[in-house]
Every structure is written in structure tokens, then in C-alpha cells.
Amino acid sequence: MEKAHADEFPLTTDSSEKQGVVCIFGTGDFGKSLGLKMLQCGYSIVFGSRNPQVSSLLPRGAEVLSYSEAASKSDIIILAMHREHYDSLTELVDYLKGKVLVDVSNNRKINQYPESNAEYLAQLEPGAHVVKAFNTISAWALQSGTLDASRQVFVCGNDSKAKQRVMDIARTLGLTPLDQGSLMAASEIENYPLQLFPMWRFPFYLSSVLCVFFFVYCAIREVIYPYVNGKTDATYRLAISIPNRVFPITALILLALVYLPGILAAILQLYRGTKYRRFPNWLDHWMLCRKQLGLVALGFAFLHVIYTLVIPIRYYVRWRLRNATITQALTNKDSPFITSYAWINDSYLALGILGFFLFLLLGITSLPSVSNMVNWREFRFVQSKLGYLTLVLCTAHTLVYGGKRFLSPSILRWSLPSAYILALVIPCAVLVLKCILIMPCIDKTLTRIRQGWERNSKYTQSALNGKSDI
């Protein structure tokens, strides 16, 4: 038996083939854009309008009729109109009976109404088969053809045959339909386009708080303190020096916070003796935001690298170097080469370079195009094993940078330690807790729990009852 080549099978239906008649209620931007796209894919389009005589700028080849006349032309009607105009459809109950009504509308706010637009439409037209679809596609994307970033179409409805017909239309348009179940999912589908970075809010807020706190903290130590004690103007540090302390500190803390929720979850499972209990909402949301926390941390690490690269061209640095050279020439004295200082300097630079390289690797593997090409074990190895190695290298980079100054009273300003000492608290705590959890006696118990073993049967009973200790 001969094997057929993949290129012998078309990915989408041939656009030259006649696909049937589809009716679109509404001649706005979305209705016209969707109609044009469907015409290009071989469909015959009939627009329904309140004023068919004055409708203009419609795709060539489309027919414009009144709502009742257009409804009689097709079994599938796409409602490209807002919810506020659904009441006008009550006059067309007889015309819409048995038809497939595709609701593409969105609201202005999340959960604006008690029920979804699709469910509201189903109440108005009980004899029709309402399907929610195409609300995640913009009119601009349909017109320009840039559908790569929004190719997925969520579809839901109570009638499986009606859903299948709508999904066939989506495939013909080159889209990827995803069946979301019954019409009860319409509310979630309608809320999806209205979300504004839901998983990024916590990382942004947290990073903003950390940046502001450490910026003010460093400004007190490095700008306000010298001015109060010696009338020295060090405000120039606000542009480069202080941000170049704040950015790596924020990056290190955020990186540690990526792995802290996993440790807390392990401790919680050990305490409960079972995995069949939901985590607290705050911990659950924190774990869902780990990827975003890591990417924000990578962004701050990038800023640290860029700010470090511009250090040699700063006026302050060039002035110090020039002044030191002139002073040595006038006094005829040179500074001795100290091998230990060279080791410390090169070590913290090497640790920083290696840490940033692995940080980049973590960021690259978190991209969907890359993560989809590796299996779960490979992804877990990179994000977990190499992730902790990255945290170790970045923490060691900061420790070596501090050197002996940790124990020196001279770094205190108004009894305030250097900012990098505060930055090491969370990363060191995470690494210490991780070392405890990987001890054989603890790791063996944790592995058994995650494989389904339970220490006490009462946890199973309370889990079934939906109770929580925390």
C-alpha cells in the first residue's frame, strides 16, 4: 500500500469551493471584516441590516437585505451586534426558529451582566441554537490578515451539531476552534478578551514595590547620609549607581520568589501528609505566576547588565581614573597588586556571567515555541535543576561581591546595612530550605506523598468534604 505524502492533503478547505450561504446581522467593522474573509474562503454572504438601503462600504459580492429577508436565506446567522440591540430580535422569533445563531459580542467590563450575552440571547430566542464563537478575533486582524497571534477560537453551545457547523466555518477561515463545552462556558469566553495581563499583575506590583523600597533605601544611605554628615552632593548617583544596585537586587529576590512557593507547597504537603488537598488561594495564585515572576526577574537582570556595561563611559568613573593616575604621577607612588583582590573581583564577575547565561537559558525555554519542543522531563530539568543552579550562582555572585564587608561596621549608615545584605535574605532562606527538603529521609516521604500515599486517612475524608486547614 502506497503512503500518501502530507502535502497531498490540504490544511484548509479550498477557497474556490462554494461553501454555502451565511447570514451576518450587522454591518459594522467586525461584520464587514468577517464577511470579507468568508467571501474570500468561498462563502456566499448575506448581510442583514436595519437600513439596507443606506448600508455602504460592504464587501463586493455580498447581498444586503432586511433582517427578516436575510434570515430566510441561511441556516447560520452570525450576530455582529451589541447586546443592547438583541431586544430587536424578538420580532424575528418565527424567522430564527431552528437557526444557528452565532454570538460574537463582548462586553465593556468583566462580568458586566448577571448572565453571559450568549445565555441572554438563548433566553430571547428559545427556538434557536445559540453558539458562542469568534469573540476573541478582532476586526483589524481579520482585515489585515495578521491572525498568527490570535488564531484560536473558543466555541461553546448546547447543541453539538450547531457547534460542529460553526467549528467547520472556523477551520475554513484558517482558524483553530477549541470546543469549550456547553453555553455555561460563554461567560468565561466573553471575559477572556477583557482581561489585562491577569498573571502579570502580581509580578508587576511586587517588582514595583521592591524597586521603590530599595531605591529609597539606597538613596538614604548613598545620597542623604553623605549630605547630612559632610554636605557632599551625591545626587548624581540617582541616575546610574543606585538603579544599578536596585535592578540586580530585585532580579535576585524575584528569582528566589519563583522557587519559594514550590518549597512552601512541599512543606504544606508534608504537614498534611497528603496531596489530595487544595493549596490556599494565595499560594495557588503565586504558583501560577512563577513563569511571569521569572521573566520579570530576567528583565531586571538585563537592565543590570546594560547599566554595568556603561560604567566605563561615565564621567564620574573617568574622573576617578584620571585623578588617580595624576595623583600617582605627582607622588611617584603606585598601588601594589593584591592577588586576593584580583581573585575576588574575577570570581564575582565569572559567577555573574554564568548566572546570567543560565538565566537566559531559563527565559528561552519558558517561551511556548521552545517549551512545546521538549518533553516534560527535559522541561522540568531545565526549570528546576538548572533553575536552582542559577539561583546558587546569582546568590554566590552577590556573596562574593560583598566579601568581608558583611562583618565590617564601616558599611553601616545610620545603622542601616548595605542593600545587598537585605537582598540575600530570601535567596539564602530558599536554598537552605531546599537543602533540607532534598535530604533522603524527607525527600523519600515527600515523593511517596506525591505518588498518592497518605499519612492519615482523616485528610482524605476532609478533602472530600472540601475543608481546608489554611
Curated annotation (Swiss-Prot):
Its cofactor is FAD; heme b. Residues 247-395 form the Ferric oxidoreductase domain. The keyword Membrane applies. It is a multi-pass membrane protein. The keyword Nuclease does not apply. It is found in: Cell membrane; Golgi apparatus membrane; Early endosome membrane. NADP(+) binds at residues 27-30, 49-50, 67, 81-85, 106, 139, 171. This is Metalloreductase STEAP4.
